[in-house]
Structures are given as C-alpha cells and as structure tokens.
Swiss-Prot record:
Location of this chain's protein in the cell: Cytoplasm
BP GO terms, sorted: fatty acid biosynthetic process; malonyl-CoA biosynthetic process
Metal-binding keyword on record: yes
Cofactor descriptive note: Binds 1 zinc ion per subunit.
Record pathway: Lipid metabolism; malonyl-CoA biosynthesis; malonyl-CoA from acetyl-CoA: step 1/1
Protein name per Swiss-Prot or TrEMBL: Acetyl-coenzyme A carboxylase carboxyl transferase subunit beta
Entry function: Component of the acetyl coenzyme A carboxylase (ACC) complex. Biotin carboxylase (BC) catalyzes the carboxylation of biotin on its carrier protein (BCCP) and then the CO(2) group is transferred by the transcarboxylase to acetyl-CoA to form malonyl-CoA.
Entry keyword Zinc-finger: yes
Length: 281
C-alpha cells in the first residue's frame, strides 16, 4: 500500500510533435538557435552577432544578380586523375562520391548577368565540394571566367571559399596558382576591374594566388584568411599568436584587405565601387 496518494490529477502534456530536420541552425559564433526562415531572410547571417554562415555559389548568384537571373557556363568540366592518386580511396571515387552526396559537380561555379543593370561575371567557390580545394578544373574555370569577362567587356568578381590546393592532383593543382594569376593579368591589360571577395575560409594556395590580387580585396566579417592555419603556425614558432590573427578585421588593420562588407550591403557596395572604377578619366 502506497504511503502517499495523489489527490489531484497529474499535469497532462500533449504528445510531442516531431520537428522537421533542418528547421533550426545553431550560430557557430554566439550559439544562438535560429529558425531557417529567419536565417534565409537575414541572408544567412546571425541577427545577434552578425556571424556569416557559409553559403553555396547559387545563393551568391541570387544575391548579386538582378532578379537572381544569370547564365552559368562551363558547367560540364570534370576532374581527371593524372596521378592515379589514392589515399583512403581512389581520387575518382572520392570525386564521384562527393558529386553523388552533394549534388555539386565541382568546387567553383561560373555565371554572368546584370548587377544593378551593369554586366558582371562571377566565379564563386564552394567549400562543400572537397573543402573548396583548387584542382585543375577549378583553375581552368576561374581562367575561363576571366576570358568571359574580357569577351563581355565586364568586371570579374571571384568569391573565394577554400582550404587551399587539391593535394590529390599534386603539381597539377599547384600550377593553377600561376595559371589563374597570369590570366587575371589580361584583365588588367584590358583595364577591366577584378574584385576579390574573401569569405570563410580563404586559405592555402587560394590566398597565395588570385584571392589577394584584386584591384579591390573585400572580405566578409570575421573570415579566416591566410596560408597555413593558426594552429600550424603556433606549433611551428612555439609562440602565441595575436588575438584575431588571420581574421578579416586583423588583415584590414594591417593593410591586407581593403574593406569588410556585410552580406546585406554587398550588392550595393559592389555596384557603386564598380561604377566608380569604370569611369573614364
């Protein structure tokens, strides 16, 4: 026999409702829980701390081009396997599995269209495809984007989001650093602006090549930008690094970045800057 007897009925709760996956996202910076719709409306930036989430190229296209309308080109280029490279799996298998899993075909997408009524060519990298690494296809597509800009007599914007060179392609990957830099020189010869937008992360061979060669180097807030990662540097020199080292704000303070632009202001600032750069004196 129980010593205590409940006189009043217990609190009744309704059955728990299943919450669809992907409805909420946690901010990596401040930890705030954000509803997907709220995040989309805020261009995938945290309304509390302004942390910029990584976004895919097509979202940049939607943001930058008028009415989100653009024409993509060079979509069918695919990576080869010149070294017959194998780590935990064969390189072609890794590429195939990434395509199957992500629905993406490479770590960069090219498009052209109108930005505030003016022609613009955009080459946008995607960290979601093998860390946004630059292999022979990525280098070729960025080079072709420069060619298309010359053909259209239009500015070129390259959006960097990469961990660096694609080591599975060895020297073929490293060659793309020189290849892209050389092709961008042609833009300068034609007096066409090249704008580099660095997002989180812009590292390794990307920062050591085209990402730092812009007529204007722009960054999103708090983007990680550098060659080797901060942990590698710290372990090598055996010293603590300055606070904020390799973040966009640190680079702006030391003259490596020209401006930091919030994603909400990107299209307007870009259009105004390009209009000034194209004025004939």
């Amino acid at each position: 026999m129980a010593w205590f007897k409940r006189v009043t009925p217990s609190i009744r709760t309704t059955d728990k409702r299943d919450t669809p996956e992907g409805m909420w996202a946690k901010c990596d910076s401040c930890g705030a829980m954000l509803h997907k719709k709220q995040l989309e409306d805020n261009l995938f930036t945290c309304p509390q701390c302004a942390h910029h989430f990584r976004i895919a190229p097509y979202k940049y296209f939607s943001l930058l081009f008028d009415e989100g309308e653009c024409t993509e080109f060079d979509q069918n280029l695919r990576a080869a396997d010149p070294l017959s490279f194998t780590d935990t799996k064969h390189y072609p298998d890794r590429v195939h599995d990434t395509i199957e899993k992500s629905g993406k075909t490479e770590a960069v997408r090219n498009a052209y269209g109108k930005c505030e009524g003016a022609d613009l060519v955009v080459s946008a990298m995607d960290f979601g495809f093998i860390g946004g690494s630059m292999g022979s296809v990525v280098g070729e597509k960025i080079a072709r984007a420069a060619d298309r800009a010359i053909q259209l007599d239009a500015p070129l914007l390259v959006i960097s989001q990469s961990g660096g060179a694609r080591m599975m392609e060895g020297a073929f990957s490293l060659m793309q650093m020189a290849k892209t830099a050389a092709r961008l020189t042609r833009l300068g010869e034609k007096k066409l602006p090249f704008i580099s937008l660095m997002t989180d992360p812009t590292m390794g061979g990307i920062s050591a090549s085209f990402a730092m060669l812009g007529d204007l180097n722009i960054s999103e807030p708090k983007a990680l930008i550098g060659f080797a990662g901060p942990r590698v540097i710290r372990d090598t020199i055996k010293r603590d690094l300055p606070e904020g080292f390799q973040r966009a704000e640190f680079l702006l303070e030391h003259g490596f970045v020209d401006m930091i632009v919030h994603r909400k202001e990107l299209k307007q600032r870009l259009a105004k800057t390009l209009a000034m750069m194209r004025v004939e004196v």
